[in-house]
């Protein structure tokens, strides 16, 4: 068996093929210069392919994983239902079923039929839907717990759950789904906190090799962690424990929260190393790492029987 390696990538990216402000080639160049191993160009309702037309790779790096943001805007356009299809083999036309749950489910199904995995994007964008809807959806592999677009309301608000709370509610309902951090990048020419710039959120996939199949499989099986700036030097997840080590610069303070069913805090650990021994009655266990800089990282849940 080949040794597993870690590969960093962004799975939510826009170009001038939809509503981004720079060309696909220049966008890919930005991620190459910043040492990303793989990239999904996820233009709205468009499959932006730079590698596959000639049957050979156009760029040495990053690896291009085919994708699309399947975008249905229902109820007169006021409710955006946007779902990334990752690893798809063809364009997926959005389906507008008018009802939120039916629209999500129809587009998830269409992505799977196109050979991809489905990532539910920014549920709090325009307050489109929350855990109540997602509890009724089957087949989705991923959910954005962090989205770098400044208007996606990831932290929620009065009476509105945060993306983390939505994730915990869906997990508590028994729906297995993995949490991703993404850029949702649109702006490469103008940089400010009010713009959707690259480099804000990413996933780090553990795989045997850097290939489309290996990366998509790693995402589908939860063999990754998500981050907005924290790097893990070690991550060991087994049915009996979660152990991690944070890359430390000697100044930043880190703390890790282990979370179980119902969003319950199981343990909080301050420092570079954190470990949780699984008891078996937690429902699931996942870890969130926080830094004094404001950066975060998320491990994927270990699912436990009743």
Predicted features along the sequence, with ranges:
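A metal-dependent hydrolase metal-coordination microenvironment
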Residues: 1-132, 136-139, 145-167, 173, ...
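C-terminal functional module detector
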Residues: 1-6, 24, 173-178, 183-306
């Amino acid at each position: 068996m080949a040794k597993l390696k870690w590969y960093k990538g962004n799975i939510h990216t826009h170009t001038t093929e939809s509503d981004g402000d720079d060309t696909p080639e220049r966008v890919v160049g930005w991620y190459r210069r910043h040492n990303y191993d793989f990239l999904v160009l996820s233009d709205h309702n468009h499959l932006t392919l730079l590698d596959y037309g000639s049957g050979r790779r156009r760029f040495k790096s990053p690896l291009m994983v085919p994708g699309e943001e399947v975008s249905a805007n229902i109820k007169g356009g006021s409710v955006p239902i946007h779902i990334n299809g990752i690893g798809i083999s063809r364009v997926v036309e959005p389906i507008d079923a008018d009802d939120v749950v039916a629209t999500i489910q129809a587009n998830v199904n269409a992505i799977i039929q196109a050979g991809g995995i489905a990532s539910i994007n920014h549920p709090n964008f325009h307050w489109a839907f929350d855990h109540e809807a997602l509890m009724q959806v089957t087949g989705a592999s991923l959910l954005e717990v962090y989205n770098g677009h400044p208007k996606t309301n990831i932290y929620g608000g009065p009476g509105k759950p945060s993306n983390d709370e939505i994730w915990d509610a869906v997990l508590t309902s028994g729906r297995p789904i993995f949490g991703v951090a993404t850029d949702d990048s649109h702006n490469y020419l103008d940089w400010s906190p009010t713009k959707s710039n690259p480099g804000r959120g990413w996933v780090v996939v553990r795989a045997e090799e850097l290939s489309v199949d290996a990366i998509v499989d790693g995402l589908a099986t939860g063999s990754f962690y998500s981050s907005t700036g924290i790097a893990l030097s070690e991550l060991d997840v087994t049915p009996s424990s979660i152990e991690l080590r944070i890359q430390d610069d000697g100044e930043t303070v880190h703390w890790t929260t282990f979370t179980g069913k119902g969003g319950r805090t199981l343990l909080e650990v301050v420092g570079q190393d954190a470990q949780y021994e699984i008891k078996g009655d937690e429902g699931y266990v996942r870890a969130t790492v926080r830094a004094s800089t404001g950066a975060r990282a998320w491990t994927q849940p270990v699912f436990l029987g009743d």
